[in-house]
Design a protein with these regions (language model features):
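Non-catalytic, surface beta->alpha helical segment in thiol-disulfide oxidoreductase systems
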Residues: 79-80, 85-121
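Hydrophobic heptad-repeat coiled-coil signature
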Residues: 38-41
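Acidic, Ser/Thr-rich intrinsically disordered and amphipathic helical segments
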Residues: 15, 43, 47-50, 91, ...
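Non-globular targeting/processing and membrane-anchoring segments
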Residues: 112-137
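Conserved beta-strand elements of beta-rich interaction domains across eukaryotes
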Residues: 15, 35-36, 68, 89-91, ...
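N-proximal helix/coil linker or "cap" segments that precede and/or mark the start of modular domains
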Residues: 1-6
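Thiol-based oxidoreductase modules, predominantly thioredoxin-like and allied folds used
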Residues: 10-12, 33, 44-71, 78-81
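A short beta-strand-turn-helix
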Residues: 9-28, 70
Length: 137
């Protein structure tokens, strides 16, 4: 089970729309627009898997292949890969380009918080990733 992938590969606009709806108003979504032929996209993949685990209860991590989902690529005006978005409550908070792992991590921390800042519903530090966690704003 430890090898199970946490990053969701979005294969259609309808699945993307459903994921936005399912995330609700409090959960962030990190989206990577990528291409299978994009070397830097492949290089950052393992770190995205780590982020998906570290932020399991607060952020959904998904990947969208621009060649398979042209409508979404056009909707978000994707011109370079990888392009990342952080979305919350259907609103794009930030969009940036590049495979710099440090930039991706620091941007996630800026908008979502650090993984160790997970709090339970009573405001106490949670033990790992319990089911009653909320993002520190």
């Amino acid at each position: 089970m430890a090898s199970q992938k946490k990053v969701i590969v979005v294969e259609s606009k309808s699945l993307f729309d459903k994921m936005l709806e399912d995330a609700g108003p409090n959960r962030h979504i990190l989206v990577e627009f990528f291409a299978t032929w994009c070397g830097p996209c492949a290089m950052i993949g393992p770190r995205l898997e780590q982020l998906a685990v570290e932020y399991n209860n607060r952020m959904i991590v998904m990947k969208i292949d621009v060649d398979e989902n042209e409508e979404l690529a056009l909707q978000y005006e994707i011109n370079s890969m990888p392009t990342f978005l952080i979305i919350k409550n259907r609103v794009t908070l930030v969009q940036f380009v590049g495979s710099n792992v440090s930039k991706v991590v620091s941007t996630v921390e800026k908008y979502v918080g650090k993984p160790d800042e997970v709090k339970d519903a009573k405001g106490k530090a949670a033990e790992g990733s319990g089911p009653q966690t909320v993002a520190k704003l």
